[in-house]
Amino acid sequence: MDKANDYLKDYQPAKLVLATAGITAASILAYQAITDRDFKDKLNKKIFRSIKSMPGVSDIVKKERAKAKVELKKMFKTDVRNAHYTLPLKGIKHEDLIEEMKALAKVDESHWVDSKVSGCVYLGEKEHTKLLNEAYSLFSLSNPLHPSVFPSIRKFETESISMVSNMLNAHSKVVGSLTSGGTESIFMAVKAYRDFYKDRTDRPEIVVPVTIHAAFDKACEYLKIRIVHIDVDPVSYKVDMAAMKKAINKDTILVAGSAVNFPHGIIDPIDEIAKLAQQYDIGCHVDACLGGFILPFAEKLDYDIPVFDFRIPGVTSMSVDTHKFGYAAKGTSVVLFGNKKLRRAMYFVAPNWPGGIYASPTLPGSRPGGLVAACWASLVSMGNDGFLEKAKGVMETTKKIIKGLQSINGVKIIGDPKAMVVAFTCDNIFYVNDYMSKKGWHLNALQRPNSLHVCVTAKMIGMESLFIEDLKDSIKLVKDNSGSLPKDGTAPIYGSAHSVPDREMVGTILSDFIDELITPDYKPSQST
């Protein structure tokens, strides 16, 4: 100690304090960099926040946010005639109300009835829609939470799960549950793995392709799970298996892949992902929310479809949406598990609640039994032959669209799509999208790389020639006006959003958009 004091006697106390503080701070940062697996992202956020708080910069940011909000709001229009911002003093007559709602429904229908919408409306046939509506109306008061009062709903639910399970070549131990949609199916699967492996790690991680559905990110944010995104091969756009294997560690509880993925319609190498899961004794989830009702039937029709389901050893769960290509009413999906023990990890039970014994398989307590009935009705009415017929039409239309895209100079298809989703890009792709929108098309804008995709539905069967014709014309219009491309529309928004390095800022603008979306166009008075 005396030697240390002699050595430091010539240093000013203030300098010693500052030096010590600096070394301590540097040590803390170094420790965080080593131990905090998301340190880089957190550091980037702090840097961008510091820049945005600088004088002058914050004003620019506010102005750009305001401009973006104005443009984003143009993307949705609401009829504010006969608006009800407070309860009417007297209830409106049923017949008058229905007439008003019919008029509004007609406006909505005009946006998709011409078959120019990617995904969204998957069938839209009047007779099938009528069946769904009648099935719902018969059980509109029912609730699966009360099985003794509504035993028929249990029949519809368990049989729907069984039909979907069988379609995906499930073995005898596979079980499942009905959910409200793909996001909930994925959420419940992730929750099940977290709880199933809780004795193994208290810092769970999942390893997934960067192209997997954002519902995995949502689930991990809610459930406090670290999500590790793996890049895809720049040619095939399938997940990089070497990188996936490298990312697995002692805290990894799950690997996952898509069949097909939402952005590009690519089927990940599920067999290789499942082998990794077996090797490391972890779960393997296949997200087939989009492809689950097309791929099995396309395979039967001898299209080149790789095996992606429970036939692969190591696949321990799957998600598939009945409300997409299962043609059920919006609000149903199925999550399947390889055994009952894994499914039980999904449940919530509250044995000590004063309100009685409470338990539920998924997130909601009460659920609309009418949707369960409509789901069952859709599956049973379509049957194997019905799904085969629709799958053939969808696959043939997709094949012709791919051929048409390949014939257009300057257009590049992303990867090698095997089913009904085709992503493509070209110069000024978002301006091309704006011109396609003016022709009535509703396509999906993508990023990384900037591109568009079309999800071919049964509603779009036979629309391939018009699609390619309109796309060629839109590309020509962009080329002809390349020196004076419009500053309005969605192209500037998408272009800037995809190129901005500050992703937190993009997230803020998206939150601004949601604010506008769920806020009344007119702020109601508090008086009635």
Curated annotation (Swiss-Prot):
Belongs to the group II decarboxylase family. Sphingosine-1-phosphate lyase subfamily. GO terms for cellular component: endoplasmic reticulum; endoplasmic reticulum membrane. Coiled coil: none annotated. It comes from Dictyostelium discoideum (Social amoeba). The modification N6-(pyridoxal phosphate)lysine is found at K324. Its main location: endoplasmic reticulum. This is Sphingosine-1-phosphate lyase. It catalyses: sphinganine 1-phosphate = hexadecanal + phosphoethanolamine. The keyword Ligase does not apply. Pathway: Lipid metabolism; sphingolipid metabolism. Keywords: Endoplasmic reticulum, Lipid metabolism, Lyase, Membrane, Pyridoxal phosphate, Signal-anchor, Sphingolipid metabolism, Transmembrane, Transmembrane helix. It comes from the Eukaryota. The chain crosses the membrane at residues 13-35. One of its GO terms (molecular function) is sphinganine-1-phosphate aldolase activity. The lineage of its organism: Eukaryota, Amoebozoa, Evosea, Eumycetozoa, Dictyostelia. GO terms for biological process: actin cytoskeleton organization; ameboidal-type cell migration; carboxylic acid metabolic process; cell motility; chemotaxis; lateral pseudopodium retraction; negative regulation of aggregate size involved in sorocarp development; positive phototaxis. Its cofactor is pyridoxal 5'-phosphate. It is found in: Endoplasmic reticulum membrane. Disruption phenotype: Cells produce short fruiting bodies with a thick stalk and drastically reduced numbers of spores. Mutant cells grow exponentially at the same rate as wild-type and are 25-fold more resistant to the antitumor agent cisplatin than are wild-type. Mutant cells survive longer in stationary phase than wild-type cells, but are effected at multiple stages of development. Addition of 50 uM extracellular sphingosine-1-phosphate to wild-type cells mimics the developmental effect of the knockout, and leads to increased cisplatin resistance. Cleaves phosphorylated sphingoid bases (PSBs), such as sphingosine-1-phosphate, into fatty aldehydes and phosphoethanolamine. Sphingosine-1-phosphate (S1P) probably acts intracellularly as a second messenger perhaps by promoting cell proliferation; the absence of S1P lyase increases its concentration. This leads to increased lateral pseudopod formation as well as defects in the efficiency of chemotaxis. Its EC number is 4.1.2.27. It is a single-pass membrane protein. Pfam families: Pyridoxal_deC.
